[in-house]
């Protein structure tokens, strides 16, 4: 038999079987990397959420009254529930936590069972779009909390809004830490979006290459 005959499936010359194995290897590596990154993201968001939800401080706030030589001090407890924007912040982080947990369970299940969804581009598209939405949700919620924190720190004399961080220093410190961690989580989430986009469009390239190899093999047979 001529030694220069056409390569069999799985030979070094490339084949649909080799391309499918390449797709499977890429899928497994992608799942492992995304599990680690999403786990890090989840830890950041949980810490940010926990700091804001548990942040409490009781202090005395001066209330000036006309006709009185000195302001009247009233005891108040600073907490996120008092501000609508911070309720949005906490709710947004809760949504991201829920989504990330579900996505982690999905990916862990695929790795544990050696499952694959490489042929389902619709799933990759949904994941990419949802990841993008979570990233923008984190960024917008952190921006809202930053604006509220700025008003609490500096006040707004033009509309007679007083500074409150001078009376609630501990609350504002923990508040700031929570917001900074949220911004870091937003950056990590956009790294996740980038990986999702890379995986999505790589699927198109690998599948197109596999289709060309199949057509070439059919033509040579």
From Swiss-Prot:
Domain of life: Eukaryota
Cell membrane as UniProt keyword: yes
Protein keywords: Cell membrane, Membrane, Transmembrane, Transmembrane helix
Cytoplasmic side: 1-31, 113-122, 196-221
One GO cellular component term: plasma membrane
Extracellular side: 53-91, 144-174
Topological relation to the membrane, as annotated: Multi-pass membrane protein
Region (Disordered): 1-22
Compartments it resides in: Cell membrane
InterPro entries associated with the record: CASP/CASPL, CASP_dom
Residue ranges of the TM segments: 32-52, 92-112, 123-143, 175-195
Lipid biosynthesis is among the record's keywords: no
Pfam families the record matches: CASP_dom
PANTHER family, per database record: CASP-LIKE PROTEIN 2C1-RELATED, CASP-LIKE PROTEIN 4A4
Family membership: Belongs to the Casparian strip membrane proteins (CASP) family.
Subunit structure: Homodimer and heterodimers.
Name of the molecule in the record: CASP-like protein 2U10
Species name: Selaginella moellendorffii (Spikemoss)
Phylogenetic lineage: Eukaryota, Viridiplantae, Streptophyta, Embryophyta, Tracheophyta
């Amino acid at each position: 038999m001529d030694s220069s005959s056409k390569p069999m499936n799985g030979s070094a010359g490339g084949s649909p079987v080799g391309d499918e194995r390449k797709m499977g290897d890429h899928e497994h590596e992608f799942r492992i990397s995304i599990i680690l990154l999403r786990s890090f993201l989840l830890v950041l968001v949980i810490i940010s959420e926990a700091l804001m939800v548990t942040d409490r401080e009781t202090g005395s706030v001066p209330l000036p009254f006309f006709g009185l030589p000195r302001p009247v001090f009233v005891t108040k407890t600073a907490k996120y529930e008092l501000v609508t924007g911070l309720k949005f912040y906490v709710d947004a982080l809760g949504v991201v936590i829920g989504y990330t947990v579900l996505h982690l369970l999905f990916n862990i299940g695929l790795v544990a069972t050696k499952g694959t969804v490489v042929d389902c581009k619709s799933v990759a598209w949904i994941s990419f779009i949802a990841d993008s939405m979570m990233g923008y949700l984190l960024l917008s919620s952190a921006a809202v909390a930053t604006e509220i924190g700025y008003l609490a720190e500096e006040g707004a004399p033009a509309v007679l809004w007083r500074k409150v961080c001078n009376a609630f220093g501990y609350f504002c410190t923990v508040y700031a830490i929570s917001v900074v961690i949220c911004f870091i989580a937003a950056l990590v989430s956009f790294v996740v979006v980038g990986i999702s986009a890379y995986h999505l469009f790589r699927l198109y390239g690998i599948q197109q290459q596999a289709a060309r190899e199949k057509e070439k093999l059919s033509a040579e047979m």
